[in-house]
From Swiss-Prot:
UniProt-recorded name of the protein: 14-3-3 protein beta/alpha
Source lineage: Eukaryota, Metazoa, Chordata, Craniata, Vertebrata
A GO term from the CC aspect: cytoplasm
Compartment annotation: Cytoplasm
PROSITE patterns: 1433_1, 1433_2
A Pfam family annotated for this UniProt entry: 14-3-3
N-acetylmethionine: modified positions: M1
Organism: Xenopus tropicalis (Western clawed frog)
Length: 244
């Protein structure tokens, strides 16, 4: 299949909600080695976000069941083995994406917004790995995630408008990283609030094309801030993340 056929197949897979097929098509497009267009970049991101999202959701449910079966050895063992199976799938998907990012996507990215998009993606997928990791492996994935987010953050601050949806999406996910992974609510709130305030101050720079995306992410930033600063917040806060 040539590139245009692979992209067409990815779009068809998306409409059929067959995200594993969509990811396989976009992986093949990426491995052709050319820089991806914005449309191709978004197709790749949506495909893997859905593929990994299904496993993250399953992992959380099974982990919760596993904890509730304490005292019932047989049921707990079954839950543990099933969690480990899902964990392996999740890790394989993340390693797949990180391989594409390191080999093709980050090195080939020319415009700053592409570089930020892919470095944010790198931060995201190391974050997903860290959610299921433990010990030295957890520390390594946390460090790699923070480094990727930080590099993306610095480029976005110097090269992109505060209202740019990719810059806002990065701030959203980086703040979730601080809150959930590093357990630093103050840093998470500070980052989210700065991103929101800077975007509000420059709302007049919003172009029509990205208005909807930018305002949606600003709302998510505000929702997280409200959640994080409320005194009655539960332990299992369901924090909003950027889709792309």
């Amino acid at each position: 299949m040539d590139k245009s056929e692979l992209v067409q197949k990815a779009k068809l897979s998306e409409q059929a909600e067959r995200y594993d097929d969509m990811a396989a098509s976009m992986k093949a497009v990426t491995e052709l080695g050319a820089e991806l267009s914005n449309e191709e970049r978004n197709l790749l991101s949506v495909a893997y976000k859905n593929v990994v999202g299904a496993r993250r959701s399953s992992w959380r449910v099974i982990s919760s069941i596993e904890q509730k079966t304490e005292g019932n050895d047989k049921r707990q063992q079954m839950a543990r083995e099933y969690r480990e199976k899902v964990e392996t799938e999740l890790q394989d998907i993340c390693k797949d994406v990180l391989g594409l990012l390191d080999k093709y996507l980050v090195p080939n990215a020319t415009p700053p917004e592409s570089k930020v998009f892919y470095l944010k993606m790198k931060g995201d997928y190391y974050r997903y790995l860290s959610e299921v990791a433990s010990g030295d492996s957890k520390q390594e994935t946390v460090t790699c995630s923070q480094q990727a987010y930080q590099e993306a953050f610095e480029i976005s601050k110097s090269e992109m408008q505060p209202t740019h949806p990719i810059r806002l999406g990065l701030a959203l996910n980086f703040s979730v990283f601080y809150y959930e992974i590093l357990n630093s609510p103050e840093k998470a709130c500070s980052l989210a609030k700065s991103a929101f305030d800077e975007a509000i101050a420059e709302l007049d720079t919003l172009n029509e094309e990205s208005y909807k995306d930018s305002t949606l992410i600003m709302q998510l930033l505000r929702d997280n801030l409200t959640l994080w600063t409320s005194e009655n917040q539960g332990e299992e806060a369901d924090n909003a993340e950027a889709d792309n």
